[in-house]
Amino acid sequence: LLIWTALDIRHGRAGLPRGLGFGALAVVAVTILAGALVAGMDAGLLYNEYPLMGSGLVPVEYGDDGVMDAFENPASAQFHHRWIAVLAMLTVLAFGLRAMRHHTSRLPGMLAMMMVLVQFGLGITVLLQGVPVSLGGLHQAGAVVLLGLTLWTVHRFPA
């Protein structure tokens, strides 16, 4: 909300996000929330490989905790974060490509696309390295930067 207000002051009031812009913002926000669950459960320590989680794409523990599985099972939390992150990357890339067609959103669109690729690669690196605190913190900071760049892009090109 603070970033959006700052953008309103700097560039004038923008319409509410809609369409692919809303989708990009929503999936980035959900990815951050899923990442918070991973961090809170130390779920990144379970499967330090990518794209597989043990012997397959889905961990063997998936669904063990029933209805609360997403919130109580570290393996499921990591699984969800991985695949929501893939969706976030694809959505931000699609929205960024669309935003780059308009002169007012070209720069933020390009930066958001670059950042989503950096963030995705950093997430995999953090996992493969066994989640060192320095890289984990950098990955969390990257999430904030990605959210800010996505907000900026949506503000300049809300469709």
Language model: regions and residue ranges:
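Polytopic transmembrane helical bundles with strong interfacial aromatic enrichment
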Residues: 1-159
